């Protein structure tokens, strides 16, 4: 869906011709990929809608993950014949015709384990193998074993996996890191991109693009051979994110690509479908109905696109933080996504050079440099003194500070003076007793205050360290690890998100109960333990006292979270 073209021709951004040709070649390849599996809402039509609306299961994801026992067309035909008969029982019909997902066995860790021992013991518990799946299963098969987040998340998730892999590498499980990279490469080869997760209902979108960073991580162990091996898949993923760029005029958007009036190319989150999400069917329908002033399809796409961002949901995407139906993800250019695209271009340049293609390496460097200029021009709020998202409707950078603002530092795309301002903004507005706040807004959504998420803690920590802001970085790690340790001491588990307004409490909000496991928290915790403890004295639990800054420690903000951005 393109926005209207401007009335007069605009100057085209300089994009190397060979990159355009490469996009064209990959689009032909994409047309040759196998027919993708259909999601359950399409396979089962009115039956799927009726089951979800009947709320037979507390979690809408349960039926989305159910496996038909026979051809869905036959099940649907039987349903149409039986549904109006006297005494028809929908729950009985579902139980007869579907195999419901099994609840995972409750893991009881051995007593007396340290935090590190607990995490190391969880890796095999969270490992799954689905080389073969049932014919009509929404679960997509993968050739190698993989680590899932835990809880209701029975499949592998794209951006979660990078932070999980950091922990696997820290534990010495390079074989598992290699397996997961191979799985994601398989998805790119099979579907043309990495879906949100390995479910048919996730195929219409991706997630924050960390594949190139995964390959770079693997290269720490295998050297440039990993970069050369996965260069074709990295190029194909890049083409997916840039699909449609060759036909864009200034001021237009196409799928995941945005071309601003001066020709600057940036990216946004996008889902190819504009229907309710099968895993949150009833919730999405209710959200759309609650705002009759907007087309339901527009709201559905913005809900789906927010899921593609990983931040589902957050005031970051909304006009009114208290009303989810005002979200408009597709009209926002995210600072974190474009930072990751910059990093992808830099890694593509490095991989191309390793493969002996210096000309292509130079082209990717040109693209990375152009994107870096775009980030500095459009995704920096000079008045506020922090990085932020760009609003395509108002044609202005937004004012809200979020933890996503640390991504330019994480990928080394930030100017030094701006990184220093980000350090000040972070400790003034986001740092709390239990770690880094996601935003300063209390909306009831899970990607808002008072929740803190492991991946954002690590991005901030690494990003600030990249620019010499070690004290703030160490404080973030220290406060978050203390939160993780206190929760573990009380409950003997690591969880998906934490309440950072205090320590020792899991986070709340969102569409489902708090999940434990938890892949990315495990990975980030291991990285942070090795960061705050000296190599000559590694620690298995979080030390009782701050290990680095003994005095003049940065004090976390004690300001009450504000109700509006």
UniProtKB/Swiss-Prot annotation:
Known EC number: 3.2.1.28
Assembly notes: Monomer.
Single annotated GO MF: alpha,alpha-trehalase activity
Binding site for substrate: 152, 159-160, 196, 205-207, 277-279, 310, 511
Pfam families: Trehalase
PROSITE patterns the UniProt entry points to: TREHALASE_1 (PS00927), TREHALASE_2 (PS00928)
Compositionally biased residues, Polar residues: 548-565
Gene designation per UniProt: treA
SUPFAM superfamilies, per the entry: Six-hairpin glycosidases (SSF48208)
Keyword Zinc-finger: no
GO biological process, one term: trehalose catabolic process
Family classification: Belongs to the glycosyl hydrolase 37 family.
Protein name, per record: Periplasmic trehalase
């Amino acid at each position: 869906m393109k926005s209207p073209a401007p009335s007069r021709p605009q100057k085209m951004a300089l994009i190397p011709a060979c990159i355009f040709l490469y996009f064209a070649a990959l689009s032909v390849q994409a047309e040759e990929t196998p027919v993708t599996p259909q999601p359950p809402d399409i396979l089962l039509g009115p039956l799927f809608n009726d089951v979800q609306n009947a709320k037979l299961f507390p979690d809408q994801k349960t039926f989305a993950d159910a496996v038909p026992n026979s051809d869905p067309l036959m099940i649907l035909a039987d349903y149409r014949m039986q549904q109006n008969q006297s005494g028809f029982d929908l729950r009985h019909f579902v139980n007869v015709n579907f195999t419901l997902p099994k609840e995972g066995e409750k893991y009881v860790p051995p007593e007396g384990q340290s935090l590190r021992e607990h995490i190391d013991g969880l890796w095999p518990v969270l490992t799954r193998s689905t080389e073969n799946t049932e014919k009509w299963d929404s679960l997509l098969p993968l050739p190698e074993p993989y680590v899932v987040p835990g809880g209701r998340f029975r499949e592998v998730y794209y951006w979660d996996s990078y932070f999980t892999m950091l922990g696997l590498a820290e534990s010495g499980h390079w074989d598992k890191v290699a397996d997961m990279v191979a799985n994601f490469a398989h998805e790119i080869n099979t579907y043309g991109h990495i879906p949100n997760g390995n479910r048919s209902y996730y195929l219409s979108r991706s997630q924050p693009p960390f594949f190139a960073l995964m390959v770079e991580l693997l290269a720490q162990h295998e050297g440039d051979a990993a970069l050369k091996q996965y260069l074709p898949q990295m190029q194909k993923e890049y083409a997916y994110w840039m699909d449609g760029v060759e036909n864009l005029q200034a001021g237009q958007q196409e799928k995941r690509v945005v071309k601003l009036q001066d020709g600057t190319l940036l990216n946004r989150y996008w889902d190819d479908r504009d229907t309710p999400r099968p895993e949150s069917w009833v919730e999405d329908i209710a959200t759309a109905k609650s705002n009759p002033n907007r087309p339901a399809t527009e709201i559905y796409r913005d809900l789906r696109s927010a899921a593609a961002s990983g931040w589902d949901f957050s005031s970051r995407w909304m006009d009114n933080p208290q009303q989810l139906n005002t979200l408009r993800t597709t009209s926002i250019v995210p600072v974190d996504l474009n930072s990751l695209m910059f990093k992808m271009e830099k890694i593509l340049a490095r991989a191309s050079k390793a493969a002996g293609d210096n000309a292509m390496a130079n082209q990717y460097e040109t693209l990375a440099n152009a994107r870096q200029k775009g980030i500095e021009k459009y995704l920096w709020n000079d008045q506020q003194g922090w990085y932020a998202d760009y609003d395509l409707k108002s044609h202005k950078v937004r004012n809200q500070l979020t933890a996503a603002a640390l991504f330019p530092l994480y990928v080394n795309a930030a100017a030094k003076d701006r990184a220093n301002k980000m350090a000040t903004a972070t400790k003034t507005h986001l740092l709390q007793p239990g770690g880094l706040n996601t935003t300063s807004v209390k909306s009831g959504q899970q990607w808002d205050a008072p929740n803190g998420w492991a991946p954002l803690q690590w991005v901030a920590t690494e990003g600030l360290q990249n620019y010499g802001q070690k004290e703030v970085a160490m404080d973030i790690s220290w406060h978050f690890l203390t939160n993780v340790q206190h929760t573990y001491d009380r409950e003997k588990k690591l969880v998906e998100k934490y309440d950072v307004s205090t320590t020792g409490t899991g986070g709340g909000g969102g569409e489902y109960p708090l999940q434990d496991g938890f892949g990315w928290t495990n990975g980030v915790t291991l990285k942070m333990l090795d960061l705050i403890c000296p190599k000559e004295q590694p620690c298995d639990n979080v030390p009782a006292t701050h290990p680095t800054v003994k005095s003049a420690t940065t004090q976390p903000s004690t300001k009450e979270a504000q109700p509006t951005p």
